[in-house]
Structure formats: structure tokens, C-alpha cells
Amino acid sequence: MHSQFDHVSVVKKSNVYFGGSCISHTVQFEDGTKKTLGVILPTEQPLTFETHVPERMEIISGECRVTIADNEEHELFRAGQSFYVPGNSKFKIETDDVLDYVCHLEG
């Protein structure tokens, strides 16, 4: 896991979800790929995100509980781990601490 991205463009306007509980910025690479760098603040209820393209969520710091699609069981992910969500799907995520992540948009 690299600690920085080089040779990128960053969209200055932030993506704000759930009243500010999740904030990210889009990073565009020279080859046209995109990622978002974000933070999720502690949540009392799971946040539900819908995907349009496949996404790989890389946890940079913190830990979270994730439920993918219609699964009933959640999984715990910590810094250094990733989880994959298919396109045209959804996932629920919740955290008790500040969570830093990179969302790799793979579509």
C-alpha cells in the first residue's frame, strides 16, 4: 500500500454524503482511472451506499463493519484490508472511530 499518489489531478469540490458523515475527493489518474479519498466519521446507524461500477474499498486507518448487498452478516475490516463491492449493488458501512479510505473505482 503506497502512502501517496503521484501525477494526479484532484477535483477541488468535495463529495459530501449523509449530512457530512462521509466526505471524499475524486482523484483522476493520467490513464483515466479514478479513485476517491475519503473519511467516514463515527456513525450511529449504518450508511448505505449504492454502486454503479465495481468498487474496491481500501481501509487506510480505523476499522469498520460492512454488509455487502443483501447479506445479513457483517464483516469487520481494519487498516490495510480491502473489500470488494460489485457494480449495480450496495453496501452498508458503520464505524465507531474516524475511518480513512480509498475507493478504487474499477469500472
List each language-model region with its residue ranges.
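A short, N-terminal "cap"/entry segment at the start of jelly-roll beta-barrel domains
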Residues: 1-37
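A generic structural motif
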Residues: 28-30, 67-69, 94, 106
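Ligand-binding loop in jelly-roll beta-barrel domains
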Residues: 86-107
